[in-house]
């Protein structure tokens, strides 16, 4: 099930459970995890993109190891809310991971990377450190926004 509705997504998870947030980019996938009670999202890792089969294997392993019950995937909409070329590629990614058998929420990720980058700049993180952290922190930002909307 792929949905943009937090209500539908929440209904698909009656017992809650751990969620994974994904910030899907062209070169990387930022991954974040939250606790089973949907209290707080934490950055987990950054997956360097390869062929989809390789990406899927890494995600499947993470989902199994962390007992993930649902996926929240950031959807990069244009500022006016319309779809962009990246939006279409993220929707295709969601369709490709649908066989995992987990509910999937597509969550508006506008400004997530910019918000995280601003926080890292304010923390005086070096350019290399920002590059290392931005994707998984953006995934945590996306996931936290979704869980805040559901509780």
Swiss-Prot record:
Superkingdom of the source species: Bacteria
Protein name per UniProt: Putative pre-16S rRNA nuclease
Keywords noted in UniProt: Cytoplasm, Hydrolase, Nuclease, Ribosome biogenesis
UniProt-listed InterPro entries: RNaseH-like_sf (IPR012337), YqgF (IPR005227), YqgF/RNaseH-like_dom (IPR006641), YqgF/RNaseH-like_dom_sf (IPR037027)
Lineage summary: Bacteria, Pseudomonadati, Pseudomonadota, Alphaproteobacteria, Sphingomonadales
Subcellular location: Cytoplasm
GO biological process: rRNA 5'-end processing
MF term (GO), any: nuclease activity
Enzyme class: hydrolase
Gene Ontology, cellular component aspect: cytosol
Family to which the UniProt record says this protein belongs: Belongs to the YqgF nuclease family.
Organism: Rhizorhabdus wittichii (strain DSM 6014 / CCUG 31198 / JCM 15750 / NBRC 105917 / EY 4224 / RW1) (Sphingomonas wittichii)
Main location per the UniProt record: cytoplasm
A Pfam family of this chain: RuvX
Protein task: Could be a nuclease involved in processing of the 5'-end of pre-16S rRNA.
UniProt EC number: 3.1.-.-
